[in-house]
């Protein structure tokens, strides 16, 4: 059926693109094709545990937190409130794009309500995974789970907090709490490096920070076309995936509502991406896994390795 692009302004909706399997379905390729049709590309969940591979001007790029419309100067790229951000990884990703001549600052906006991943979140992730032994869930060790735990536990730091003169005090309070928790893991050695993280936070302050829920709805009222870009896949949804071997956010289309601040009746087309065969990284049930030479051949010829972790 024809795509809904010329509808009346009052009926403008947010289209959603997401994976229907366990991630690595090829969402980046589809986003690359769809991006020219939209004015705004918005991430609504996940963080640097995601990896979208796309090709621009003949060069392959892997984006982890930044939306996939960043290579198009006329497209606004929004990191929504449902996303968790590691300032260090975020800065490195932006620096790499700037080196390629991309005007990231001119086309990127970050929600003040997005939560920050602290260095101690990554340490807690590693300590928790190590303590599980054979029962580990296959975490990417990016600190995603502990960050969402602090979010729901109402302890987290948000991007908007970096604008406060009391930010460093609040950071050290949460950091010290994490250090006390890390001390409870037997035999886990760690060292907290604050300097690089705080430097990356200072860089984050130079970027455009917005109240994304208001900006999204203003864009809709202005008749702008918006694509919500999902990460991971449906089978990794925190509620409806193969729990507990899942991610820590809602990867389904409804996640776009809470992750961007839009009403359910504002969701338009939903593009579900899947490939001819399933793949999965990490732990968890995988009923159709091929564990012989054929499986190895499919993995090799299909380059089936996680875009973020490189895991087969």
Model-assigned labels for residue ranges:
Residues 12-312:
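Non-transmembrane, aqueous-exposed alpha-helical and coiled segments at domain scale
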């Amino acid at each position: 059926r024809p795509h809904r692009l010329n509808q009346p302004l009052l009926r403008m909706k947010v289209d959603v693109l997401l994976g229907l399997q366990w991630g690595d379905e090829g969402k980046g390729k589809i986003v690359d094709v769809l991006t020219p049709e939209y004015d705004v590309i918005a991430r609504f969940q996940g963080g640097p545990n995601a990896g979208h591979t796309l090709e621009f001007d003949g060069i392959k790029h892997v984006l982890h937190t930044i939306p996939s419309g960043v290579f198009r100067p006329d497209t606004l790229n929004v990191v929504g409130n449902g996303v968790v951000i590691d300032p260090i990884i975020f800065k490195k990703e932006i620096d790499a794009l700037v080196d390629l001549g991309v005007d990231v600052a001119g086309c990127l906006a970050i929600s003040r309500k997005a939560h920050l991943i602290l260095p101690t979140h990554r340490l807690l992730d590693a300590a928790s995974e190590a303590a599980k032994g054979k029962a580990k869930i296959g975490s990417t060790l990016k600190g995603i789970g502990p960050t969402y735990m602090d979010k729901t536990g109402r302890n987290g730091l948000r991007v908007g907090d970096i604008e406060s003169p009391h930010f460093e005090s609040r950071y050290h309070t949460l950091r010290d709490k994490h250090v006390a928790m890390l001390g409870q893991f037997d035999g886990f050695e760690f060292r907290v490096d604050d300097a690089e993280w705080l430097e990356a936070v200072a860089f984050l302050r130079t970027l455009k920070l917005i109240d994304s829920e208001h900006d999204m709805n203003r864009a809709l009222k202005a008749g702008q076309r918006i694509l919500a870009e999902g990460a991971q896949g449906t089978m990794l949804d925190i509620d409806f995936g193969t729990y507990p071997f899942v991610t820590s956010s809602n990867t389904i289309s409804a996640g776009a509502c809470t992750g961007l601040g839009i009403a359910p009746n504002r969701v338009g087309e939903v593009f579900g991406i899947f490939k001819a065969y399933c793949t999965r990284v990490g732990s968890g049930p995988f009923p159709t896994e091929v564990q012989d030479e054929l499986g190895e051949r499919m993995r090799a010829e299909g380059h089936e390795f996680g875009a973020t972790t490189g895991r087969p």
